[in-house]
Amino acid sequence: MAIYAIGDIQGCYDEFQQLLKEIHFDEQADQLWLAGDLVNRGPKSLEVIRFVHGLGKRAITVLGNHDLHLLAVAAGLQPLHSKDTLAAILSAPDREELITWLRHLPLLYRNSKLGITLIHAGLPPQWDIATAESCARELEAVLQGPNWRDFLAHMYGDKPVQWRDDLKGWERLRTISNCLTRLRYCDAKGRFSLKFKESPGTQTKGGLMPWFKVPHRASHGERIVFGHWATLEVGPYEGPVFALDGGCVWGGQLVALRLDKEEPQWFFVDCQGYSKIT
């Protein structure tokens, strides 16, 4: 069985299918790890989510920020934004089945045999992998429970700007969500800067660094695979971490990384681009 991790698809169904051909994906034997943001900005979000849903256990998918946004829109808690491409999902006859499936996806997946953790965005430096798993399970229980809409109503916002173990209520759950689905930069004390999205080296605010470069982060030494950051160059980084978001929807590449080999193998498909980075 081959295991491939794939970066942010964001509704780029045609490129997704091209990449599956490139890796010779066998639906009966292989497994996909999808780093979140299945939907939005690309033209075929409905086709992507239906296809992944249909793969069943052959696909392991973690939630990204665009996936959570879809849940909030479907719940009537957020309007469709001008750049959203979610209307086809919202009007689909199988809408409720897809939305229910989506909110039951994990926020973090760890394969202990391979020693690899899959997330969408990042981990604050205070979290080791056990803490990250515990926090992910905490929020997943809410999203999968009867009060999932209540969390989504309180999800949006950039504060608190730092993880603390004594956080409670919506602030705690929002911070967990922001770390796992939005985090790119923080400072040496673990304070987040969620608004800044550019590539490393362009920081205008002193002290900011990619989350995986914070000195003495508790998860250092763990192999972590993530997406979310289209302006970060794809590839392995010290840590060790592997960045998979090639910015497909922006005209970059859709990226796959084979994980079950001793030396990871990379695969790329060029994308025509459907939106502009903002």
From Swiss-Prot:
It catalyses: P(1),P(4)-bis(5'-adenosyl) tetraphosphate + H2O = 2 ADP + 2 H(+). The keyword Hydrolase applies. One of its GO terms (molecular function) is bis(5'-nucleosyl)-tetraphosphatase (symmetrical) activity. It comes from the Bacteria. Its EC number is 3.6.1.41. Keywords: Hydrolase. Disulfide bonds: none annotated. It is an enzyme of class 3 (hydrolase). Hydrolyzes diadenosine 5',5'''-P1,P4-tetraphosphate to yield ADP. Belongs to the Ap4A hydrolase family. This is Bis(5'-nucleosyl)-tetraphosphatase, symmetrical.
